[in-house]
């Protein structure tokens, strides 16, 4: 399916052959028309230029979210998140909407996704994952797209049983999410941040969870290229037939 779409978008496959390929995969005639109609608009508009940057892990994470159109981040505060707040203070395009408790912040992100139809972003302390899970269950049942990020103890000294920390909060979060991951390499900060938003927002929607250890969030001198997400967005909504 992926190769078929790429050939069509790259104009190496005709509309007729692309439709025949979809039909061979089991798509109905109406589904074929909807997919072809959506892809026909995928390359409209100017292609935004990528951003080559160097900064902390948190600055890379924030720049990646902004490249995906994120302007609101919900969450609470904690010491382990301080590198991210430093990154927020250096810009004015994205705002942090704070709550006094993680369960409330989760409900705010859930409501934002339901009202706006956009993937919500939630950033909470790793020690507050149990509080987050209380209301994340509701978002999971509603199939609400929420990219949940959390901090964590440094991965350079694992197994120290840090204060109020569990070595692995991913396993309990797996029950109420589509996908969980811990970023242990600075080269994957942008990649996994993008993937979190993409997986959460891909139908059927649902929460995802990505954990960033403190040394990854605060890592200096991270070099990367941030690509605007609209360059890769392909509409997948079913288009109605005007004649019907």
Identify the function of each model-found stretch:
Residues 1-14, 39-41:
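N-terminal secretory signal peptides
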Residues 34-44:
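Signal peptide processing junction and immediate N-terminal pro/mature segment
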Residues 24-27, 43-244:
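N-terminal alpha/beta PP-like core and its mobile active-site loop of ThDP/TPP-dependent enzymes
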Residues 4, 33-34:
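A generic structured-segment signal
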Residues 14-32:
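N-terminal export leaders
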């Amino acid at each position: 399916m992926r190769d078929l779409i790429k050939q069509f978008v790259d104009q190496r496959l005709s509309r007729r052959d692309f439709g025949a390929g979809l039909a061979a995969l089991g798509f109905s005639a109406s589904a074929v028309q909807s997919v072809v109609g959506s892809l026909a608009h995928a390359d409209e508009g100017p292609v935004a230029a990528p951003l080559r940057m160097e900064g902390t892990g948190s600055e890379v994470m924030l720049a990646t979210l902004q490249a995906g159109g994120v302007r609101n981040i919900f969450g609470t505060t904690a010491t382990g998140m301080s590198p991210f707040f430093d990154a927020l203070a250096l810009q004015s395009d994205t705002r942090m909407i704070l709550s006094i408790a993680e369960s409330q912040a989760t409900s705010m992100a859930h409501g934002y996704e339901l009202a706006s139809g956009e993937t919500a972003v939630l950033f909470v302390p790793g020690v507050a994952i149990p509080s987050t899970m209380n209301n994340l269950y509701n978002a999971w049942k509603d199939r609400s797209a929420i990219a949940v990020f959390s901090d964590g103890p440094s991965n350079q000294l694992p197994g120290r049983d840090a204060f109020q920390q569990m070595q692995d909060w991913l396993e309990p979060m797996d029950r109420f999410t589509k996908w969980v991951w811990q970023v242990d390499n600075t080269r994957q900060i942008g990649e996994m941040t993008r993937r979190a938003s993409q997986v959460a927002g891909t139908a059927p929607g649902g929460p995802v969870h990505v954990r960033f250890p403190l040394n990854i969030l605060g890592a200096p001198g991270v070099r990367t290229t941030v690509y605007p997400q609209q360059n890769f967005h392909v509409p997948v909504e079913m288009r109605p037939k005007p004649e019907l």
